[in-house]
Amino acid sequence: MVDVNRFKSMQITLASPNKVRSWSYGEVKKPETINYRTLKPEREGLFDEVIFGPTKDWECACGKYKRIRYKGIVCDRCGVEVTRAKVRRERMGHIELKAPVSHIWYFKGIPSRMGLTLDMSPRALEEVIYFAAYVVIDPKETPLEAKSLLTEREYREKLQEYGSGSFIAKMGAEAIQDLLKRVDLDAEIAELKEELKTASGQKRVKAIRRLDVLDAFQKSGNKPEWMVLNILPVIPPDLRPMLQLDGGRFATSDLNDLYRRVINRNNRLARLLELNAPGIIVQNEKRMLQEAVDALIDNGRRGRPITGPGSRPLKSLSQMLKGKQGRFRQNLLGKRVDFSGRSVIAVGPTLKMYQCGVPREMAIELFKPFVMREIVDRDIVQNVKAAKRLIERGDDRIWDILEEVIKEHPVLLNRAPTLHRLGIQAFEPVLIDGKALRLHPLACEAYNADFDGDQMAIHVPLSEEAQAEARLLMLAAEHILNPKDGKPVVTPSQDMVLGNYYLTMEGADREGEGMVFKDRDEAVMAYRNGYVHLHSRVGIAVDSMPNKPWTDEQRHKIMITTVGKILFNDIMPADLPYLQEPNNANLTDKTPDKYFLAPGSNIQEAIKNLDLNIPFKKKNLGNIIAEIFKRFRTTETSAFLDRLKDLGYYHSTLAGLTVGIADIPVIDNKQEIIDAAHHRVEEISKAFRRGLMTDDDRYEAVTATWRDAKEQLEARLVETQDAKNPIVMMMDSGARGNISNFSQLAGMRGLMAAPNGRIMELPILSNFREGLSVLEMFFSTHGARKGMTDTALKTADSGYLTRRLVDVAQDVIIREDDCGTDRGLTITAITDGKEVTETLEERLVGRYTKKSVRHPETGEIIASPDTLITEDMAHYIAEAGVSEVTIRSVFTCNTRHGVCRHCYGINLATGDAVEVGEAVGTIAAQSIGEPGTQLTMRTFHTGGVASNADITQGLPRIQEIFEARNPKGEAVITEVKGQVTDIEEDAATRTKKVYVKGATGEGEYTVPFTARMKVQVGDEVHRGAPLTEGSIQPKHLLEVRDTLSVETYLLAEVQKVYRSQGVEIGDKHVEVMVRQMLRKVRVMDPGDTGLLPGILMDIADFTDANRDIVIAGGIPATSRPVLMGITKASLETNSFLSAASFQETTRVLTDAAIRGKKDHLLGLKENVIIGKIIPAGTGMARYRNLEPLAVNEIEVIEDSEEQEDTVEE
C-alpha cells in the first residue's frame, strides 16, 4: 500500500487509451449485474469476479479454493484469483467503445477546451459530435475550407461536384478526433505569439485564451486527441454497490444504470457494424452511444437529464464529486467517526474548569475497549469475548474499572455550529448519573451554548499522540483568551456576576458599621453571627494580611472596607493589590491610600467622609481576569475563575434577588412627556399641511420626536432608579438585560418597524407593566417576526462567508522565524470622520517594530527595530504622543505560502510570540467569520434625502469588501496629486465638476449633484483620495495607487464595520485575508521569460521566473497586481484539490487535467483530502521525524507493548 505520509505531490492528467488499458483487469462486455437466483455476479458483467476480484475474502467464485493458504492462486475452473475482497474497491475494468466518443467536460465546459484547441465554435462542435453536420477534415485539391461545416445535403452535392474521394469530411466524435490529431501545437503556438504582438481588443482576448490551452497541452505532454474516448474505464464495483433489501428487491447505485445503457448501446452498435447496416442507423446508434457516455460522465450537462424511477435524474460521476453531498465535502473533508456520542447538555456548577460530566452509560460505551482490556488484564474473565458479555450484562465490577480507565484520559466536546476553534475543547471526564452531559458554566461563552435543550457531541481521542494533543493544546482551562482579539473569553456571566456585584456593594448606615476587627476570620465570624452586614463599612488590621503587596506607610494601619470585599479579595492571588475600587489604578498599581487610618483614629468620622464605592460589574471582572492572566498565565487564571464562579453562585443564592411586578418603577411625569410629544407632532403636521415641509421631512421630524420622548423617559428612569432594586442590580451589574429592556418595562416601547423595514410613525405608548392594547400588540409582532427571519438568514450568510474565508486562507501557516523583508507598514489610528474606530495603541500591541520609535519631544528611542511591543510599551508610545509607527506586517512579509513569526507578531490566543507551524490563516478566517452573525443585515438609510445612495453596512458590507465588488454609493477618487482649483455646479445635467491641478497634470471629475463633497476649493489631495463621501472601489484604487494603499484601505474598512457593531478583531487577522486577495499578478509583457501574456500568476512564482531571466541577462517580464474576491482567489489557488473541493468542481478538474497540474500539498485542505498529516503544528516537515527519547523508562515501554498485543487478539 502507498504510504500517504510520504507523498510529495499529486498530479492529475488526461488518461491515454493505453493508460486506461493498463488500469483495467478485463473488459466488461455484458450489461448484466448479478444473477437474481444465485445472487452471484454474472460473467463479463458489471460485477464480474474474474475482472474485479472475489466477493468473499480468500475464496474463489466456484468454491474450489477456500482459506488464506491459497493466496494468489487463480482458480482453474472459474478463473477468479484468491485474494481479499477489498480489491473490489480498487480494481477497474474497461469498455472498448466501437466508435470514438467525445468527453463532455472538454467539449461542453466554459470555455470549451476542444473549441479553443481547434479554433471552432462550441455550436459547430455540437453539430458535428451529435451527427447534425459533416466537418471537412482534409479538402485536398478542392476549394473547400478545412474545419468548415457541411449539412447532409451540401455534403452529397459537393461529393457529386468534386467526385468521391476528392476530399475527406466526417461527422461525430471520430471527425473531431481526426482534427485533434492534426493539430500542430508548436506551429499554432508560434503563430499565436506573432498575432499577439499586433492584436488588440476581442481578438487579443481570444488569442490569449487559445494560447493558454495550447501551451497547457504542450507543457503537460497531454495529447489533444485524448479528449475523445476510444475506451471507457469502469470504476470498481464496490464504489457503485448493489444491496439486497429485505423484500428481496435490490437497491443499486445510479452508475450501474448509466453503465448498462452505455454497454447496451455499444453492443448494439457492434452488431449493426457486423451486419453492415445502413449508414443512417449506424449514425443514430453512434449518437445514442455518445449521449449515453455523456450521461454517465455528467448527466444533465447537455439536454435533459436521464431519469430513473419517479422522474428523478440519475446521479452521474460528476455529481458524485460535486456539492455538499459529493465525494469531496461529504467523505473526504468531513467523516463520521467512531467512539463518539451526543446528548443534551446540562449545567455543571460544581465542576472544575478542566472537567465535564459524562453519563455512566455513555462512558462505558465510549471506553468499552479500554475497559475490556483492563477486565482481561485483571483476570476477571479469560478472553475479550467474555469481557464484552460482562459489560453488556452491566456487571457491578465494571464501574470501578471504568473510573480508573477514564482517569487522565481527556475527551473532546463539540457544539455545532463550530464557528471558531473554541467550538471543540478537551475536558477530563467525570462520571455522573443521569443522561445529560454536564458542561462547566464558564465554557458556555466559547461554545455559545445555553441549557435550553442544546446538544453536544463527545469524542474520545484514542492514540497516545491524540491524547497528548487534547491534554496539552485543547484543554478548556488553557483557552482563556479569544483568538480573535486576545481578550478573555471566559468572563463570568449572569448569576456569577450578580453574586459578586451584590457581594461588593457598599451601604451607608448598615448594622455593624464602624466595627474594627483584628483579622479576616473575626470579621467573617461577626458577619455569620449577624453582628455586621456584608455591605457595612468596617475596619480591619492591615497586618493580618501580610501576603498582600502593601506600601510601607500602609502596613501597620487600619483599612476601611466591607466584609463582602474581604471575602471577594480572599479568592484573589496574593500578589494582587487589595481591591477596593473597580478601576484599573487599584488593580494594577496599589490600594488607594484614602482607605487607611492610623490606629486610634475616629473610624466613624473617616467613614462619613468617604463616598460609597460602586460594586464590581461584569466589565470589571473581565479586567481582573485579563490582569491575572497577564501576570500569572493559564494555570493560576483557571483556578481563580473557578473560585470566582463558586463565590458568585454562592452569594447570588444568599442574596435571593427576585423580580416581582412591584419592582418595575412608575415614572411620575410620563404623561407630561407624551403629551408634549403629541403636541409637537400636531405642529409638524400643521406645517406640512401648509406646505412648509416635504413629506419626507415630516416623516423624519415625527419619528425624531417620538425617539426623543422615549429618550427623555429613559433619562428619567435612570435618575429615579433605586440602586437596591433587583431589576436595576441585574441591569447595572451586566448580569442580564440592558437599559432598553428596562425602559420597555417601565417607560414606553417606542417606535416599531413595519414589515417592509420602514419605521412606523405611530409609536407604542404603553410599557409592559401597564400592558399593551390589542393594536399595539399587533404592531409589535412585525418586529418580532422580522427579528427571527433576519437571524435565520444571517446565520446562513455568515456561515457561507466563513467557509469562503477559510478556503482562501487555509494554506497560510507560520513557515519560518524571520523572512528578512526590507519593507514595513506605517500605521496610524483608524478614524471614521471625526471618530476614532481603532486607536494606535490597540493596533500596536503584539507587533514587531520595523523602524525605531522615538519620543517626539525628547528624541529618546522608545523601541528599537525588531522589538515586540508589549501592552505597557504601546501605552507609553501612545502617551508620548507618537502618531505613526512603522511595524512588521503580514502585508509586507516575503515568506512563500505563509507568514513569518516576526511579521505576524504574537498569537492572540496565548499572548506569546507565535510558533512556527501555527495555522494562522484558518484562525484569521474563523476570527472574521465567527462574529459575522452579530453584524446587522440591513443597509441603513443615512437620514433623509441628503445622500444619493444608502451606505451598506454590517454583513453585506463585509461581503462586498472581501468579494472586491463595486460598492454601493461609490466615492469618486482623484488620479492626480495636487490642489482642488474649482468646483462647478451644472444645474442642467444635475452634476458638479471638480477640477484638480497638480505638478504632473490635471484632472476633471464629474460627481452627482446630490453627492456630499469631502473636499473644498484649495484643499491639497493625493492620488487616490476620495472627493466625495462613500466607499472607494478598491480595484480603481489599485490602478491609481500601489498594492499597499489598497491593503491599508481594505483593512480600515473591515475594521470600521466590525468596530461600529462593537466587535473587536485583531488587525493581523484582516491582514492575512486581504493579503490573500492580492497574491496574484497579471503578466503584461513576458519579456524573455517564456510566460504567456495575460495569465495570472502567484507573485512568488513571477519573481522567481524574472530572477532566472535577469541572471541569464535577458529582459524580465512586467506585470500588474490583481485584486481578487475571496471566491475567485480560492478557485485560482495553485492547489487543484483545494479548489475542486470548494466550488465549480468539474471546471477546476477539467482545467487541472489539461494542464497536468501538480498539487504540492502545501495547504491544510489538500492534505486532509488525501489523508496525510496536515503541515501545521507538529505535522510540519521540520518536526516530522522527531523520535521520542526514552529516559530511564525502558522497562515501561516493553511492558506497554505486551499489553497492546493482548488487545489485538
UniProtKB/Swiss-Prot annotation:
GO molecular-function terms, A-Z: DNA binding; DNA-directed RNA polymerase activity; magnesium ion binding; zinc ion binding
The Enzyme Commission number assigned here is 2.7.7.6
- State the family named in the UniProt similarity comment for this chain: Belongs to the RNA polymerase beta' chain family.
Q: Which InterPro entries match?
A: DNA-dir_RpoC_beta_prime, DNA-dir_RpoC_beta_prime_bact, RNA_pol_asu, RNA_pol_N, RNA_pol_Rpb1_1, RNA_pol_Rpb1_3, RNA_pol_Rpb1_3_sf, RNA_pol_Rpb1_4
Any GO BP: DNA-templated transcription
Membrane-spanning ranges: none
For Zn(2+) 1, which residues are the binding ones? 60, 62, 75, 78
- Where is Mg(2+) bound in this sequence? 450, 452, 454
Cofactors required: Mg(2+); Zn(2+)
Q: What keywords tag this UniProt record?
A: DNA-directed RNA polymerase, Magnesium, Metal-binding, Nucleotidyltransferase, Transcription, Transferase, Zinc
What is this protein for, i.e. what is its function? Answer: DNA-dependent RNA polymerase catalyzes the transcription of DNA into RNA using the four ribonucleoside triphosphates as substrates.
Which GO CC terms are listed, alphabetically?
Answer: DNA-directed RNA polymerase complex
Source organism per UniProt: Streptococcus mutans serotype c (strain ATCC 700610 / UA159)
How does the annotation summarize its subunit structure?
The RNAP catalytic core consists of 2 alpha, 1 beta, 1 beta' and 1 omega subunit. When a sigma factor is associated with the core the holoenzyme is formed, which can initiate transcription.
For this protein, the record's SUPFAM superfamilies field holds:
beta and beta-prime subunits of DNA dependent RNA-polymerase
Q: Which residues bind Zn(2+) 2?
A: 819, 893, 900, 903
What is the catalytic activity of this protein?
Answer: RNA(n) + a ribonucleoside 5'-triphosphate = RNA(n+1) + diphosphate
Its protein name is DNA-directed RNA polymerase subunit beta'
